[in-house]
Amino acid sequence: MKITQEEVSHVAKLSKLAFSPEETAEFATTLTKIVDMVELLNEVDTEGVPFTSNVAANINYMREDVAQPGWNREELFQNVPEKERGYIKVPAILDDGGDA
C-alpha cells in the first residue's frame, strides 16, 4: 500500500509539524515500506494457533498507595520560560481556542 506525500503532509499538518518536501518524500517512502512489511503478516498461516492477549505472566500486581512529598514549586519554576498565575504557560495548539 503506497503512502503518498499528500497523506504525510496532511497528517503532519494535523500534528502541527512542518517538514521539507525532501523529508515528506522520505517519510512517505519509509511509511510505505513499513506498511508493506506489516501486510506480509496477512500471509502467515495462523490456523490452529491459540489467541494470545497477554504474553507477560505479571497480571495486576498492586502496591500500597503511599503519598510521597512532591516537588518544590519555586525550584521547578526556575526552568519554566513562561508562567501565569502559578501555572506553566504553553503555546496554544487549537487555532480557535477549542471548546474547553
From Swiss-Prot:
- GO MF assignments: asparaginyl-tRNA synthase (glutamine-hydrolyzing) activity; ATP binding; glutaminyl-tRNA synthase (glutamine-hydrolyzing) activity
Q: Which cysteines are joined by disulfide bonds?
A: none
Q: EC number(s) in its UniProt entry? A: 6.3.5.-
Record's keyword terms, sorted: ATP-binding, Ligase, Nucleotide-binding, Protein biosynthesis
- Cross-referenced HAMAP family, in alphabetical order? GatC
Biological role: Allows the formation of correctly charged Asn-tRNA(Asn) or Gln-tRNA(Gln) through the transamidation of misacylated Asp-tRNA(Asn) or Glu-tRNA(Gln) in organisms which lack either or both of asparaginyl-tRNA or glutaminyl-tRNA synthetases. The reaction takes place in the presence of glutamine and ATP through an activated phospho-Asp-tRNA(Asn) or phospho-Glu-tRNA(Gln).
- Name listed for the protein in its UniProt record: Aspartyl/glutamyl-tRNA(Asn/Gln) amidotransferase subunit C
What phylogenetic lineage does the species belong to?
Bacteria, Bacillati, Bacillota, Bacilli, Lactobacillales
